[in-house]
Design a protein with these regions (language model features):
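Metal-cofactor-dependent catalytic cores
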Residues: 1-285
Length: 285
């Protein structure tokens, strides 16, 4: 097995960036979900609420980054001042975040048709993952919960096979917004992986990822009119464990070391979860 793709998402819920290689540190992939859009009160906003976020492209620059959206004037975001801060929430986590300059926030609010703030996870920000799954003091940025999302090509192929068998269109891996994609022949092997090793770095697969309405959205347009993977996940990937309810695709992973991962790197299984993950069994139609 080998690494087939690597992605970061500099702005939470905006378009991803494909990478040929990526450094790995305690937070995951540097630059991943270090910026986020919130409402005026600091509550995080994603494609679940605002599908148009899928239309925002992020181009990293020497100082900060540029935001682009078709039909809109580019926004050049300057580095935030550490003293300009606000308290924001990501799910149940409270974070002190640096706030973008007023002009960037004004332009972004015009783009999205509502008052928003662009905030940054800077050197003063602190947040940790759920200790029940990831262990104590595991740092995270503005991700939904963990540092890295791992998916496999074999699992996507199996999901698309189920969609095709029911006369439904196929979807791409971008619907699931992974960080590390592993090329596999087998479907769902990740359910049995407790830990893998890539380029000398251990990754603990700590929790399966339950999926939401974002998987139904085209990741270029934000449209929900195209192929929808949710019915297939409902048929073949419904969790039977009440701790993680809903349809599953991919696993949240926590790195246990630093290093660099490159496309083509070999993936070794170093610890298995023989029981896999319990799924609901649906009666044949």
């Amino acid at each position: 097995m080998r690494v087939s793709d690597l992605f970061i998402y500099p702005l939470k819920s905006a378009r991803g960036i494909a990478l040929p290689a990526a450094d790995i540190d305690a937070y995951g992939l540097p630059g991943d979900r270090r910026a986020m859009i919130t409402d005026a009160q600091g509550h995080f906003i994603t494609q679940r609420e605002l599908p148009d976020l899928a239309r925002i492209e992020v181009r990293p620059e020497a100082t900060a980054f540029r935001l682009l959206m078709q039909g809109k004037t580019d926004i050049s975001v300057t580095p935030p001042q550490p003293e300009n801060r606000m308290d924001v929430t990501v799910w149940k986590s409270a974070v002190s975040a640096a706030v973008a300059d007023p002009e960037s926030n004004r332009q972004l609010s015009e783009w999205l048709g509502r008052e928003v703030r662009l905030v940054f996870f800077d050197g003063q920000a602190r947040r940790t993952a759920n200790a029940e799954w990831a262990g104590e003091a595991t740092p995270v940025t503005f991700t939904d919960g963990y540092q890295i999302l791992v998916t496999t090509t074999g699992s996507l192929k199996a999901l698309n096979a189920d969609l095709a068998a029911h006369g439904e269109g196929s979807v791409g891996m971008e619907r699931f917004r992974p960080n590390i994609v592993i090329d596999t022949d087998e479907a769902w092997p990740e359910d049995r992986w407790a830990a893998i090793e890539i380029a000398g770095i251990r990754f603990d697969l700590v929790k399966p990822c339950s999926r939401c309405i974002m998987t139904t959205q085209d990741q270029l347009t934000g449209s929900r009119e195209g192929p929808n993977p949710m019915p297939a996940m409902g048929r073949i990937r419904m969790s039977a464990d009440r701790r993680v309810p809903g349809p599953l695709f991919g696993w949240n992973a926590t790195p246990r070391g630093n290093g660099k991962v490159t496309i083509g790197d070999t993936v070794n299984i170093i610890e298995e979860r023989p029981e896999g993950w319990a799924l609901k069994r649906r009666a044949a139609a």
